[in-house]
């Protein structure tokens, strides 16, 4: 007759020595415990993790143990579902033998596989973004292929813009023509400027101030005086002189 209690106690002792940092006893009757399983580090030291809870049934290992995912980190819902299916399959295959180590090892491998899938998915997303950016750059460089439809659309827009430019230019030329002075207007403008200058001088009268410093060196200038020149001839050469 199988002593299920002894087999369970022996396995618990083995599990505690194998997983000293992740094994936790929850209760002794019925025997219940958790084991935390962590994947190997992936890209950027990212990991996925789950804590498995096991409870021995009365006739374990001839009956499968009760199991559940007690907690998890960085796992999607479909990952959790896959792990539970894996546990069910492994439990059936190992029925009649102590199996907790086998179940935990299978989950460990599954977590490593999930990390690899995450890495692959991110690499594919990165490549897809690079491809989209490259295609956008090519489209920008080569431009949009010309079709009858987009050419007619462009032509209509171009003609409308050209018409607006012509209207603006005509308006500016018309305005410039209105502001252009005739010959008579230019003459009257010049005459008015002369009159205003004369009026300014008359209004200033004796109030006009002269800066004498401008003339302070005039005495030092050697002005040529014809009478002081012994060779001076008041009659210009070539002119007719009469007594």
Swiss-Prot record:
The modification N-acetylthreonine is found at residue 2. GO terms for cellular component: cytoplasm. Residues 142-197 are annotated as: Interaction with DRG2. One of its GO terms (biological process) is positive regulation of androgen receptor activity. Residues 208-243 are annotated as: Disordered. The modification Phosphothreonine is found at residue 144. Residues 209-231 have a biased composition (Acidic residues). Keywords: Acetylation, Phosphoprotein. SUPFAM superfamilies: UBC-like. Residues 10-114 form the RWD domain. Belongs to the RWDD1/GIR2 family. Interacts with androgen receptor. Interacts with DRG2. Protects DRG2 from proteolytic degradation. This is RWD domain-containing protein 1. It comes from Mus musculus (Mouse). The lineage of its organism: Eukaryota, Metazoa, Chordata, Craniata, Vertebrata.
